[in-house]
Amino acid sequence: LGTGREPPGLQRLAEPLHDRSPHQAWLWKVLTHRSGAPITAPYEWIASGGPVLDQEFWKLTPWQRNSMGQLEAVELHESEMPAAACALDPIAAHAGMRLMISGTTLFLCRRKPWAFSAAPFRDLADCVGAGASLAACMTGSDKPEAENLLEAFTAAAQTAAGKLPSIEGFWLSGGGAYTPIFPPSTYRAVACD
């Protein structure tokens, strides 16, 4: 064993934005036969009871800083969803997107592909905690458009402050179009490495 083998090398499973969630990148490669950033938003939409649509989906997460200065998701209550929809939908429509709501989870969808990728929200605490800004946790040629959209959402939520909980910002992640998932097999899981 081991004779004639190549020296070990570093294998990168995902782009740097997803370094804190390589398990998602690996699972994405196994289940879809595609590389790149793992796309999770359309599957979250479908898992929450939404129909399969031929559009890109993005999960929109409202956030605030906790007492320790870390980012945490703001859980909206069902009674707050109409106010959230009234505040956010006009901005989404102006950007060529549609605000979709499933339960208390916000999604954006659009027909035109978006050259933008962002770290998953649950990884932001590490990303921002390391001294980086939120802007360092996103990439792509459409990044300025996404940043402007997030700023507009934040301003709208703060304007509707009496009807919504304290929201310091929004985050888009998991974006992309639905891709059929292939049944996993041990062979494909190993071959994916």
Predicted regions and their residues:
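…; additionally, a secondary subgroup of soluble metalloenzymes is captured
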Residues: 1-193
